[in-house]
Regions:
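Membrane-proximal helix-turn-helix segments that form the acceptor-binding/catalytic region
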Residues: 125-149, 155
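Conserved donor-binding/catalytic core segment of Leloir-type glycosyltransferases
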Residues: 147, 183-211, 222
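Carbohydrate-associated surface elements
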Residues: 152, 173
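Nucleotide-activated donor-binding/catalytic signature segment of Leloir-type glycosyltransferases, i.e.
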Residues: 234-252
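Aromatic "clamp/platform" in nucleotide-sugar-dependent glycosyltransferases that forms part
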Residues: 272
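Short hydrophobic beta-strand element within catalytic cores of glycosyltransferases
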Residues: 289-292, 302
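Conserved acidic donor-binding segment of nucleotide-sugar-dependent glycosyltransferases
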Residues: 304-305, 309-320, 327-334
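A short, well-ordered alpha-helix in the C-terminal region of glycosyltransferases
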Residues: 335-350
Length: 370
């Protein structure tokens, strides 16, 4: 098959996240099976407009902000002649409304849709624009086959008017061969970590407040990731008088991330909504429990009481208190870190990128054959 993927960013982008990791891991494997994959995405400063990474031919156009407005024009003028067997639109940020494009076959791939959570992050005018851009999905994409990365995302699509029969749930994977436990690396004193982007909607502030409530002088919170909310979070740590025990690591390379997760007593995630929660499975693969919000997507990457703890998310003050209580439980029973971590590792091993790629390819072939 000749395949075109439309995604807001590629996996080399400095701001790449879980959607881009999925893109790389799944579609590089599809290339390895003998198929041709092109990617049309946004560009950034000082990067070539044409590239090839992991066998995927990359076409870059516009910026993060202009890509949705330039993608169709670029496709019409430069890529339509390639006569793709199938086009995959990763419904990421602002929809491209590809059912209005002239393509043979189309699949919509969804990690998660913003819905009302966009108002936690963006200014009211921008948030309203994104929210409104999602409103036509149920009507415009009603005849399009969907691939969702979690049952939570599938249910969100159904609520928006997409037929349940049109949705195939294919979970993400995790590289359990690279991400492995090493109990000898576990920190002697309680260490909690957050791994992800520092954006307002991720609610890292609740992780910091929960850690402050723990009130344990020998404990440490390490925050790995970049984003425009870092200064606010640093200010919060100072206001709570815990700046000496909260470390902001910035971007952490893959090899250092593994050691960070191995050292941690738990990984903590407070996001109100994710496609699935890849960072939770990365922690689990390293034998580290997870304390996370019982929110859409995330709840499918943690087995409450077995691989970590899920805390109610509706009331933020109560949520921070519940996260602090979960941290305190691990501190009071250190052996629980190993027990939960061992179960987490077994759980993570059931999610592989090979399976995700195989299931995705089977779904695409099924759509093309109809």
């Amino acid at each position: 098959m000749r395949i075109l993927v439309l995604n807001w960013q590629d996996f080399a982008n400095p701001q790449a996240g879980g959607a881009e990791l999925h893109l790389q891991q799944v579609f590089s494997r599809i290339v390895a099976r003998g198929h041709s994959v092109d990617l049309l995405c946004s560009s950034w400063a000082n990067v070539p407009k044409r590239d090839n990474r992991d066998g995927i031919d990359i076409y870059r156009v516009g910026t993060r902000h202009t890509y949705p407005f330039l993608a169709k024009r670029y496709y019409d003028h430069n890529l339509a002649r390639n006569n793709y067997d199938i086009v995959i639109e990763d419904l990421n940020k602002v929809p491209l409304y590809t059912p209005m494009w002239e393509v043979k076959k189309l699949v919509a791939l969804v990690h998660h849709l913003f819905g009302g959570t966009v108002f936690r992050e963006a200014s009211p005018p921008l948030a309203a624009a994104v929210w409104l851009s999602e409103r036509p999905l149920g009507l415009l994409y009603r005849k399009v086959p969907f691939q969702a990365v979690s049952k939570s995302t599938a249910e969100d699509l159904v609520r928006r008017g997409i037929s349940r029969n049109s949705i195939r749930v294919i979970y993400n994977g995790v590289d359990s061969r690279a991400l492995t436990p090493d109990p000898s690396e576990r920190a002697e004193q309680p260490l909690f970590v957050y791994l992800g982007r520092l954006k307002k909607y991720k609610r890292v502030d609740l992780v910091i407040r929960a850690f402050a409530d723990l009130n344990l002088p020998e404990s440490t919170l390490e925050i790995a990731g970049t984003g425009n909310y870092r200064a606010n979070l640093e200010g919060l740590a100072r206001s709570l008088h815990i700046e000496g025990r909260v470390k902001f690591l910035g971007f952490v390379p893959e090899d250092q991330k593994i050691h960070l997760l191995r050292r941690a007593w738990a990984s903590v995630l407070a996001s109100p909504k994710e496609g699935w929660g890849i960072s939770n499975l990365e922690a689990a693969a390293c034998g580290t429990p997870v304390i996370a919000a019982n929110s859409p997507g995330i709840r499918e990457s943690v087995i409450d009481g077995e691989t970590g703890f899920l805390v109610p998310q509706d009331d933020e003050e109560a949520m921070a208190a519940a996260m602090a209580a979960a941290m305190r439980g691990l501190v009071q029973s250190p052996n629980l870190v190993s027990v939960l971590g061992s179960a987490a590792r077994k759980f993570a091993e059931t999610f592989t990128w090979e399976r995700a790629a195989n299931d995705t390819l089977a779904h695409l072939e099924e759509v093309v054959s109809k």
